[in-house]
């Protein structure tokens, strides 16, 4: 029962945007930069950071479901450790959205529920499949973060610092999942994941 209460609290905090980071925000060492951007640039960056915030909401749901369904204690611990770092990402993105005068996606409850269901299915398929799903997810997230870094205005050093640290963490999570025995996913599954990601990013940029 205590575990269920704890996991329910994690879900509520992720959806509500009340997550706190354990690590310092990478942007804290940089000066404020929103005044150096035009209104259009701020709207664009806010859209990108809202996408990244949604991605971290989904990451919380995925890791939570996969942690609950893991057979092996070491795999469960690995999922939990990665989820804690993803909480940092979630808090950093939320803070940056506030700096930009924007807000998280209104569809966060939907994103969370969908990601939890996917993570549960992956977890029930076995630890190797679950780890493979983590590895592929992180590979796609790494690619998507690289695209966002290319699309940031040159003056936006704070978002850049956050996304660069997030990308480094995602690469490490993916490598760890592969090293722990994650199996490669079939091409149709990878394509389906990319399609779902496109739907999410298109909607989250605006809503």
From Swiss-Prot:
Its main location: membrane. Its EC number is 1.14.99.60. The keyword Membrane applies. It holds the Pfam family COQ7. InterPro entries: COQ7_proteobact, Ferritin-like, Ferritin-like_SF, Ubq_synth_Coq7. The keyword Transmembrane helix does not apply. Binds 2 iron ions per subunit. It is found in: Cell membrane. Its cofactor is Fe cation. It catalyses: a 5-methoxy-2-methyl-3-(all-trans-polyprenyl)benzene-1,4-diol + AH2 + O2 = a 3-demethylubiquinol + A + H2O. SUPFAM superfamilies: Ferritin-like (SSF47240). Pathway: Cofactor biosynthesis; ubiquinone biosynthesis. Disulfide bonds: none annotated. Fe cation 2 binds at residues 86, 138, 170, 173. Transmembrane segments: none annotated. One of its GO terms (molecular function) is metal ion binding. It is a peripheral membrane protein. Fe cation 1 binds at residues 56, 86, 89, 170. GO terms for cellular component: plasma membrane. GO terms for biological process: ubiquinone biosynthetic process. Keywords: Cell membrane, Iron, Membrane, Metal-binding, Monooxygenase, Oxidoreductase, Ubiquinone biosynthesis. Belongs to the COQ7 family. PANTHER family: 5-DEMETHOXYUBIQUINONE HYDROXYLASE, MITOCHONDRIAL (PTHR11237:SF4), COENZYME Q10 BIOSYNTHESIS PROTEIN 7 (PTHR11237). Catalyzes the hydroxylation of 2-nonaprenyl-3-methyl-6-methoxy-1,4-benzoquinol during ubiquinone biosynthesis. This is 3-demethoxyubiquinol 3-hydroxylase. It comes from Cupriavidus taiwanensis (strain DSM 17343 / BCRC 17206 / CCUG 44338 / CIP 107171 / LMG 19424 / R1) (Ralstonia taiwanensis (strain LMG 19424)). The lineage of its organism: Bacteria, Pseudomonadati, Pseudomonadota, Betaproteobacteria, Burkholderiales.
